[in-house]
Amino acid sequence: MPLTPPPNPQKTYQIAILALGLVLLAFVLISDHSPKVGDHLHNLPFGGEYKDGTKSIKYFQRPNQHSLSKTLAKSHNTTIFLLILGLIVTLHGLHYFNNNRRVSSSLHCVLCQNKH
């Protein structure tokens, strides 16, 4: 059985845009943009305490916050800009594909239901 493309590929594009939007949203929610402290051997990204002979490091341990609230609290302008831009592009793409499908599937007036 040979593989054939779908007769209307717009549904495929709509799902791809939605999936890309979800991937971008997941990336923003999961990524950690907090500053890292310590050296390459003693990394304390969330605060804490380390003692070793002559070396003693103690950083404040922050309460566990959701990474989105940390991102917004730090106001990383690039992250916020990309999130808003991705949302706008996703909504525009969904609107475009929905309008195209509606026009191509029905050749009658939306207001009066007559063909013109």
UniProtKB/Swiss-Prot annotation:
Its main location: host cell. It is found in: Host endoplasmic reticulum membrane. Residues 1-11, 99-116 are cytoplasmic. The chain crosses the membrane at residues 12-32, 78-98. One of its GO terms (cellular component) is membrane. Residues 33-77 are lumenal. The keyword Transmembrane helix applies. Keywords: Host endoplasmic reticulum, Host membrane, Membrane, Transmembrane, Transmembrane helix, Transport, Viral movement protein. Disulfide bonds: none annotated. GO terms for biological process: transport of virus in host, cell to cell. TGBp1, TGBp2 and TGBp3 seem to act together for cell-to-cell propagation. TGBp1 is the main movement protein that physically cross the plasmodesma with the viral genome. TGBp2 and TGBp3 would facilitate TGBp1 function. Plays a role in viral cell-to-cell propagation, by facilitating genome transport to neighboring plant cells through plasmosdesmata,. Belongs to the Tymovirales TGBp2 protein family. This is Movement protein TGB2. It comes from White clover mosaic virus (strain M).
